[in-house]
Amino acid sequence: MYLEKLELKHFRNYEDVNVAFSPQVNVLIGKNAQGKTNLLESIYVLAMARSHRTSNDREMVTFKKDAALIRGEVHQRLGNTKLELLISRKGKKAKVNHLEKARLSQYIGQLNVILFAPEDLALVKGAPSVRRRFIDMEFGQIDALYLHTLTEYRAVLRQRNKYLKELQTKKATDKVYLEILSEQLSESGSQIIFKRLEFLQELEKYADKLHNQITQGKEHLQFQYESTLKEYQGKSVLELKQSLIEQYKTMMDKEIFQGTTLLGPHRDDVRFMLNDKNVQVYGSQGQQRTAALSVKLAEIDLMKEKTHEYPILLLDDVLSELDGARQTHLLKTIQNKVQTFLTTPGLSDVAQQLINKPKIFRIDNGKITEENSFTIEEE
């Protein structure tokens, strides 16, 4: 899978752009604040129907314009697919081969992307919400049912939290309705926990192998899912649902007192273990970065296994955050395998030696021009 063409209209600082890409490596060079990250964001939004940088869609629309339009042509092994996403005050409209999709969940998965930005190096040591988002966004691309279940869960969770607030402030007194919401939340929550455990087990297989290679056999990487549910390992979906229902009953008074849902996959976490030690607590910064890199690279192989297509890799100024050895491993792993978009003010000697015949684009205030050689930018 690769993105052949991209068209942008009124997306951030891009007024009207049409560009054709290489199926291999595309290097975006230019000074800061010229639009390199905006271009990567547009590809991410085309794939995921949401931004990784903002929850406010209006920020993606050029100032004083009514809407932004992103179009892309995706090459897949079974043929080409045309994608279109319109972002306006009324919301988003998504089309696949000119046919509008009723729900965005029906659209996501047409173009699979993996984004690796400097903040992703905090995947290991960041807040639990960072790791939950990582699981949900990456797994959601390869499992439409998981994405649908997640949407259902979040809708019921909002209802339940609202009702808990009403019980807390005595605006409501009917606990039977709370039990109904608890059962609905347990239905979708149990499926999410089960799928996450399954996903992490599959991802670990690739991540451990890559991490072992990077560390020259010195370290093994494992994932440990941490659930607010007391017993969850080795349980079926039905058993997980029953456990959730029972724990919601036990915690009812506490949840009413606090006015929020204290149990469920929205509060779960993942631990990264190196040789059976928690790297979040005991690992050096170098070990944490290597673990994050291993996890990101593992996604490539897992997506290939699940979808039979390699995803697109978006590297947003991440090479500057990695030393020479990690740069080498990253670039060797993706070479001649994954379409890659790489933003940088200028490439290191290591990167220039390893990247084979890249297509180079200079970004200057929302204008894109193709170049023939690397130039190091002065900041």
From Swiss-Prot:
Annotated disulfide bonds: none
**Do you know which HAMAP family this protein is assigned to?**
RecF
Main localisation: cytoplasm
Q: Which family does it belong to?
A: Belongs to the RecF family.
Q: Gene Ontology terms, cellular component aspect? A: cytoplasm
Give the location in the cell: Cytoplasm
| Described purpose of this protein according to its UniProt entry | The RecF protein is involved in DNA metabolism; it is required for DNA replication and normal SOS inducibility. RecF binds preferentially to single-stranded, linear DNA. It also seems to bind ATP.
Family annotation (InterPro entries):
DNA-binding_RecF, DNA-binding_RecF_CS, P-loop_NTPase, RecF/RecN/SMC_N, RecF_2
Natural source organism: Ligilactobacillus salivarius (strain UCC118)
Q: Which gene encodes it?
A: recF
- Which one Pfam family would you cite for this protein? SMC_N
Source taxon at top rank: Bacteria
Q: Which GO terms describe its biological process?
A: DNA replication; DNA synthesis involved in DNA repair; double-strand break repair; SOS response
Summarize where ATP binds, as residue positions.
Answer: G30, K31, N32, A33, Q34, G35, K36, T37
Q: Which key words are in the record?
A: ATP-binding, Cytoplasm, DNA damage, DNA repair, DNA replication, DNA-binding, Nucleotide-binding, SOS response
Official protein name in the record: DNA replication and repair protein RecF
| The keyword Transport belongs to this UniProt entry's keyword annotation | no
Asked if the keyword Cytoplasm belongs to this entry, the reply reads yes
